[in-house]
Regions:
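Extended alpha-helical scaffold and adjacent linker segments that couple domains
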Residues: 1-441
């Protein structure tokens, strides 16, 4: 007897022989484990990997274990979107939209036959050498689940409880042996996780505090990012580099902070990180003149000709849920493009047309008041209306300056503006004194 018939009284903490327990559950599990197919073992393995990789039960493609997934592009401090798939490339669905990468966990027991095309966007994880302990946990887990599926009442609960015990043991083994038990293949090169991570501080890359422990998922993400770094650089060579980590979870907040800063709100560290990465800052000043992204927008608008607008679909391309600005070179997502457009509105270079309104430099508050989704669905951009030269001439004449300076100012020359500012500055003390004299009678 293996202890199956021993029970503990909850009130006295005493053990006793329980003759009502007429089923030896452990023996049933052992017996079923001997008859398990490789496919059943693979399913059990994937259950453990799913828990360790923190995958949700919400599958976009029923029947396929595939999830949208993010990996950090470590050199640029930004997450890239891709897919995590349990299985081989020839088994995954082809309907999903293209992303930047695929991470595959290959079946360890019923190994699939497929040709690795050494593609730059594919990373393969294989369990190399499960020992007897792991095989025992795995088979016990699969057997207990199998028995639970046909049992009922108390027996079902016992089998499910034993399955969870085995799953915990299996997960613990995978966590502890991960670095040597897994091989990672990228573009035909196969190494253990340990070898891939040589010379790299995984804890530092995972940004862990001194008390935090690196987990299974962190290691997979960091090593995948190391392998895919060149791939990310190849498909978006001039993508921005951020000073804070931009994730799918925080990017809406970061971009919102940047837009609020452009609208006159507090310029937070996050806002500066976004504006600076998009080259919209010259020191503390917002100035898109040196931003390659802003200048690309302006050159496209200029190419349309005088008085023409630049439509949204002339700036963003791709399917409705995956759009990019200049996908070959910059590969900017719509929220980052909107920030660039906001910088150009701020500088007076652009008017942003959205549903029911046009945002120019006099309506910057709209960048904060409108939702990011609304701004991302902008209609078009256009050049601001030309300055009224007659009014500008009158202004220069009012301050005893040559009216011809108005023409130069309207063409972007800064010298007339400086002269006008000097005249205004000289007049301010006189105006203040006059106001004070009037108050004193």
């Amino acid at each position: 007897v293996n202890g199956q018939f021993i029970s503990k009284a909850p009130d006295t903490e005493q053990y006793y022989l329980d003759l009502k327990k007429d089923i030896d559950y452990d023996a049933q599990i052992e017996k079923r484990a001997e008859a398990l197919s490789d496919d059943a073992l693979d399913r059990a393995y994937y259950s453990a990997i799913k828990a360790l990789m923190e995958c949700s039960d919400d599958l976009r493609y029923p029947g396929f274990q595939i999830w949208q997934y993010q990996v950090e592009w470590q050199e640029r401090r930004v997450e890239r979107m891709g897919y995590l798939f349990f299985g081989a490339p020839n088994d995954r669905p082809t309907a999903q939209p293209e992303r930047d990468f695929y991470i595959y966990f290959i079946q360890p027991f019923d190994r699939p036959k497929f040709s690795d095309a050494n593609l730059a966007d594919e990373v393969f994880f294989r369990l190399k050498s499960p020992d007897e302990d792991y095989k025992r946990y795995l088979s016990q887990y699969a057997a207990a689940l199998d028995l639970a599926s046909t049992a009922s009442g108390g027996a079902k609960a016992v089998y499910l409880s034993k399955a969870q015990d085995s799953l915990r043991s299996m997960s613990k083994w995978l966590q502890e042996k991960q670095m040597t038990a897994f091989e990672v293949t990228y573009q035909g090169k196969t190494k253990t996780l340990q070898d891939w991570a040589k010379g790299v501080s995984l804890r530092e890359r995972a940004r862990l505090g001194p008390e935090e422990r690196i987990n299974f998922r962190d290691v997979v993400n960091i090593v995948s990012g190391l392998a895919l770094g060149q791939r990310f650089a190849d498909i978006a060579p001039e993508y921005p580099t951020f000073s804070v980590l931009v994730t799918e979870a925080n990017r809406k907040q970061l971009v919102g902070n940047a837009l609020r800063a452009l609208a006159g709100g507090t310029r937070t560290k996050d806002a500066v990180a976004i504006l600076d990465a998009l080259e919209l800052l010259d020191g503390d000043r917002v100035d898109p003149a040196n931003s390659r992204y802003a200048q690309e927008v302006l050159s496209r608008l200029k190419a349309k000709g005088h008085g023409q607008v630049l439509n949204r679909n002339e700036l963003l391309s791709g399917s409705s849920d995956i759009e990019y600005f200049a996908p070959i070179k910059y590969r900017l997502e719509p929220d980052l493009l909107v920030t660039v457009l906001g910088g150009l509105v701020y500088s007076g270079d652009l008017v942003l047309s959205i549903t029911g309104d046009k945002i120019d430099s006099g309506k910057l508050a709209q960048l904060a008041e409108r939702s990011l989704e609304e701004l991302k669905q902008f209609k078009h951009v256009e050049a601001p209306k030309e300055i009224n030269l007659a009014v500008l001439r009158a202004l220069f004449e009012l301050f005893d300056l040559p009216s011809g300076l108005a023409q130069k100012a309207s063409q972007g020359d800064t010298e007339p503006v400086i002269k006008l500012q000097e005249k205004v500055s000289a007049l301010v003390p006189r105006v203040l004194k006059a106001g004070s004299d009037l108050q004193q009678g």
